[in-house]
Amino acid sequence: MSVYHLPTLLNPLVNAIFNCPEPERSPLKKLFANLKTRRFILLAPPSEYLLNYHDVKSKLPLHDLCYNAEFINSYILLMTENSYINTNSRDSHYETLDGKTVVIQWKNNVIHALNGFHIRRRLKILETKILPNFNDYFEGAADFIILFIDQPLNCEFVPNDYLQCFHNYEKIPKNAHAMPNLSIDSFQQERSSFENILHIHPARLTQLGQLFSSYRTLAPGDDPSRSIFESIVQQAFDGMKSDSLFKNFSNLYDLIHDYFELNLYDDIWSRLTTHFKGHEVDTEKINIFQ
């Protein structure tokens, strides 16, 4: 049994991982054992999402999934013995507990969820917190890094109905400690809706996949080719702007642009590193697709 734990923390994921009073009886006991001597970074979505949204596929509330190891694994970034955080460095590559690939652009406060994620997403780092290790079941570090991100990853999520939202709000303990209070902006809501529509309509995904292939075929071997990238984004925009599915999006072009950049990230980065081979690449100055 844990020697000490805090009052319930408002963020369900942070609370589930770091504030378990009885780790031996927890549904996450195997995860705790796996992480016992490891250093790791936790990605924490906003409390508003975790408390008031549910997963489309499983139909389970996100706060319930915070006690599901399969769900949590994607939010844990493993650190090696030589890993350290340098926010002035170029991109850092991490592996999640379940083997997925995450790239962090520290200078831009951006996280790319890439290989292994069935939904590739670009996430914004809203805040970075250092959490002192107050429990006795993690021995890998005296402090842990929590990156608060702007949305959940690796799942399609939708709001609960009004009554369920009200019910969840009432369930927040009065002594809960906020870790911070993060707002959900309108662009993020549009981006989530945009991605959900695409995954509900496979024909659209197929069409976009053909444009991804066009970029890979037409762009020269070591040249990211801004003109070709912009051309295929414009093609997608022209084909979608009159579609009733997307007519209510006020930032449709930007949503398409971000979606293409995210899904072609590996190709673009490979071309950049080949093009600048032997030179230090400053990702802050490379704004080809911005």
Swiss-Prot record:
It comes from the Eukaryota. InterPro entries: UPF0507/Ank_repeat_27. Belongs to the UPF0507 family. This is UPF0507 protein YML003W. It comes from Saccharomyces cerevisiae (strain ATCC 204508 / S288c) (Baker's yeast).
